[in-house]
């Protein structure tokens, strides 16, 4: 993710996304840059209008938000069941201290 963030930072600063620029941003952030990843990122972004891609991506989550919310309800039930098991196990563990 750091590599993508570096490219986004360069784009927002109106700088060209080059291997050297991405490496400089990563090093400034205290991250050791992997040359292969940097080259792959720059190659993947070649010819891509980042601002346009962000605008298109910003629209997509809005349409998908409703199904995700509907799917979240069953996940909450599972979490509650796990909490009950954890509580029972913790109570059993505490009971063992007094035996």
From Swiss-Prot:
<dbReference type="GO" id="GO:1990904">
    <property type="term" value="C:ribonucleoprotein complex"/>
</dbReference>
<dbReference type="InterPro" id="IPR022295">
    <property type="entry name" value="Ribosomal_P1_arc"/>
</dbReference>
<comment type="subunit">
    <text>Part of the 50S ribosomal subunit. Homodimer, it forms part of the ribosomal stalk which helps the ribosome interact with GTP-bound translation factors. Forms both a pentameric uL10/P0(P1)2(P1)2 and heptameric uL10/P0(P1)2(P1)2(P1)2 complex, where uL10/P0 forms an elongated spine to which the P1 dimers bind in a sequential fashion. The proportion of heptameric complexes increases during cell growth.</text>
</comment>
<keyword id="KW-0687">Ribonucleoprotein</keyword>
<comment type="similarity">
    <text>Belongs to the eukaryotic ribosomal protein P1/P2 family.</text>
</comment>
<dbReference type="InterPro" id="IPR038716">
    <property type="entry name" value="P1/P2_N_sf"/>
</dbReference>
<dbReference type="InterPro" id="IPR027534">
    <property type="entry name" value="Ribosomal_P1/P2"/>
</dbReference>
<protein>
    <recommendedName>
        <fullName>Large ribosomal subunit protein P1</fullName>
    </recommendedName>
</protein>
<dbReference type="GO" id="GO:0005840">
    <property type="term" value="C:ribosome"/>
</dbReference>
<dbReference type="Pfam" id="PF00428">
    <property type="entry name" value="Ribosomal_60s"/>
</dbReference>
<keyword id="KW-0689">Ribosomal protein</keyword>
<dbReference type="GO" id="GO:0003735">
    <property type="term" value="F:structural constituent of ribosome"/>
</dbReference>
<dbReference type="GO" id="GO:0006414">
    <property type="term" value="P:translational elongation"/>
</dbReference>
<comment type="function">
    <text>Forms part of the ribosomal stalk, playing a central role in the interaction of the ribosome with GTP-bound translation factors.</text>
</comment>
């Amino acid at each position: 993710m750091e590599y993508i963030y570096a490219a986004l930072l360069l784009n927002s600063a109106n700088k060209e996304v080059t291997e050297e620029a991405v490496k400089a941003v990563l090093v400034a952030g205290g991250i050791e840059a992997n040359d292969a990843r940097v080259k792959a990122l720059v190659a993947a972004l070649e010819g891509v209008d980042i601002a346009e891609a962000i605008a298109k991506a910003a629209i997509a989550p809005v349409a998908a938000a409703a199904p995700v919310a509907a799917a979240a309800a069953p996940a909450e039930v599972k979490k509650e069941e796990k909490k009950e098991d954890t509580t029972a196990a913790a109570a059993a563990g505490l009971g063992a201290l007094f035996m």
